[in-house]
Amino acid sequence: QFGLRRDSDGIAFTVGAAVALNSTLTAEISGGLQHRSYVDRTLQDINAPVINAALVWSVSPLTTVRFNQQTGVIETAVPGSSGAFTDAATLEVQHDLLRNLSITLGGAYLATNYDGVRIRERGYSATARFDYRFNRWLALRGSYIYSTLNSTIPLSTYEAHTVLLGVRVNP
């Protein structure tokens, strides 16, 4: 057999709370610790904090602002690395133009640091989206996403423009 055996066992402990700060503002926060150990002993065990936060502000009955922040560990196939530590934050503003038409504008930031190797990635994205609801369970969604990733790996930095159009079914 060639390569590393990346099978792993992991556990995470988190505690958190949700609070209604007032009639228009709610917050959630949680924190804890994650541990992961690998079958292949050449991969180091990973211990990392896990922190999540969310803030939802109902500016008006038609407009909502959402902020989310998350940290964690993700799997990777990068040689010499047990995993990657991530930190992600998103901010979205959603506005209902009509009873069945909403638009959303948002932005995101992603930082990834690989354990055991000198690879660092920083990414940013901007999103514009519309949702047209035909009824309670059927909607048309269109999105434009601009994303960029800056990496310390040569030739891994990129920019992308993505346009999506689809039908959503929520039974």
Residue ranges and their predicted role:
Residues 11, 33-37, 71-75, 109-113, ...:
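Transmembrane beta-strands of outer-membrane beta-barrel pores
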Residues 23-29, 61-67, 99-105, 132-142:
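Repeated loop/turn-to-beta-strand initiation elements of outer-membrane beta-barrel proteins
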Residues 1-4, 37-41, 50-52, 75-79, ...:
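Extracellular loop and loop/strand-boundary signature of outer-membrane beta-barrel proteins
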Residues 11-15, 31-33, 49-53, 87-91, ...:
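Hydrophobic, lipid-facing positions within transmembrane beta-strands of outer-membrane proteins
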Residues 1-58:
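Acidic, glycine-rich loop-and-beta core segments that form the ion-binding/anion-interacting portion
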Residues 19, 57, 95, 132, ...:
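Residue-level signature of outer-membrane beta-barrel architecture
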Residues 130-133, 137-139, 159-171:
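Outer-membrane beta-barrel "beta-signal"
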